[in-house]
UniProtKB/Swiss-Prot annotation:
The gene is proS. Catalyzes the attachment of proline to tRNA(Pro) in a two-step reaction: proline is first activated by ATP to form Pro-AMP and then transferred to the acceptor end of tRNA(Pro). As ProRS can inadvertently accommodate and process non-cognate amino acids such as alanine and cysteine, to avoid such errors it has two additional distinct editing activities against alanine. One activity is designated as 'pretransfer' editing and involves the tRNA(Pro)-independent hydrolysis of activated Ala-AMP. CDD domains: ProRS_anticodon_short, ProRS_core_prok. Its EC number is 6.1.1.15. GO terms for cellular component: cytosol. One of its GO terms (molecular function) is aminoacyl-tRNA deacylase activity. It comes from Mycolicibacterium smegmatis (strain ATCC 700084 / mc(2)155) (Mycobacterium smegmatis). Pfam families: HGTP_anticodon, tRNA-synt_2b, tRNA_edit. It is found in: Cytoplasm. Its main location: cytoplasm. This is Proline--tRNA ligase.
Amino acid sequence: MITRMSELFLRTLRDDPADAEVPSHKLLIRAGYVRAVGPGIYSWLPLGLRVLRKIENVVRSEMNAIGAQEILLPALLPRGPYETTNRWTEYGDTLFRLQDRRNNDYLLGPTHEELFTLTVKGEYSSYKDFPVILYQIQTKYRDEARPRAGILRGREFVMKDSYSFDVDDDGLKNAYYQHREAYQRIFARLGVRYVIVSAVSGAMGGSASEEFLAESEVGEDTFVRCVESGYAANVEAVITRAPEAQPTEGLPEAKVYDTPDTPTIATLVEWANSASLPQFEGRTVTAADTLKNVLLKTREPGGEWELLAVGVPGDREVDEKRLGAALEPAEFALLDDADFAANPFLVKGYVGPKALQDNGVRYLVDPRVVHGSSWITGADAPNRHVVGLVAGRDFTPDGTIEAAEVRDGDPSPDGAGVLTSARGIEIGHIFQLGRKYTDAFSADVLGEDGKPLRLTMGSYGIGVSRLVAVIAEQQHDQLGLRWPSSVAPFDVHVVVANKDAGARAGAAELVADLDRLGHEVLFDDRQASPGVKFKDAELLGMPWIVVVGRGWADGVVELRNRFTGETREIAADGAAAEISSVLAG
């Protein structure tokens, strides 16, 4: 196939768009691959659409290889099924909701577990029909509060979502690992650098869950890994390695002290080190010796706000992502002045476990707050703290919560070493959902014994349109985009940098020969300066660039590798065959 740039619907830009934050966003706009229509909404122009379709085809081929069958469900969905699973409420403001002229409620699909479950239930009724894997490649909709980074986080995006249905847990596990391996093949073919991490299931539900994160400094997801063992997890899924519980016998009694002007951890530590506390004789008091109580209110879907206190060591901040994952599907918010006024037993800056538990406030603590651990914390009165308050003796929390930040150097949950953090972009997520959705819709079939058998289910997603940006993010250089051959809009970009009629005719013949050899060719036949053409070729990012320029008079053309920058001269006679051989690898 030959595409002439003189006819291509394309306009490149010399300057970065003012609202672009990350390299992929800047370059995809500048190179004319996409154009913004509104916040988080983009049009796909010819070059961008070619990349998107090639990624879809890689995904499709690997899904077909594991026996998955492609279908297409509507994006406009009725409220009923999502009400049944409570996700009409759980999704909150993320869901695009609308009504038809008869005031019936609908949504634009963010994901399709409900509809796939109902589809399979409606078609199959016997254990003999299973296992089944169905998938679609379809546009999804989520009302992101802060769309950012171009197509990395938009309100409309293309996703591959597949769903496995089995009659037993062994079948589910097999489907899960089939997808896991297929995803690894997909990302290898796309040239994406990624890591597989343990993850939380969130609103999707289910048990086992893993994310595929593309390594990137602009990623929104923080993950940690242990070099020694290979352990890796999304920060929300990290389980704290708690110390051993300690006996409480023989520990000093807790004592309340006047601590003027100490509403923060820093001022409290400063006071403690000046107070010559007997428990800390011979060592310096640090923030890790203090217990910080963070006050929140939470609300289950459709419920009322309730108070919650979270206790964490004072040297740690509460990580809102971990907190949100631990509380999901409930939402949470920090207390405001009105909340404190309505609950006068909460003394801002001096809250301790006693007032919380005396007043029935649910109190969850970090796993490091083990039985027998001793703390400096608030005494529930202005300018007063208690020293030596012992967990399990002086207070008993209602449970533990994984809400404290995870830091570099923390012990790995597997005990093999320490954790280091990095950032990534979620490109895939796989779930063993189990029977959450099949229970909701009573998706039963007749088992071998003639009795009803509840199906079990897996859900597996890949961000197809996001992968366009991820590849651009990982592969670009200072000159522009650089597409791997598996997804490049064209195999080769032929640039005529010579106004000589013979050179132009020779370039056209070379392009025709490459086309006959089965290559997709972008032919820059425009009446523009060589400098403009070269800059566009580097910006657009085809993996190979052929220059028909000054060397034509000497019977040679130039072949450039866009990734390495290496160039070689090739004899004009028979150039197409030699170039084709190089392109074939």
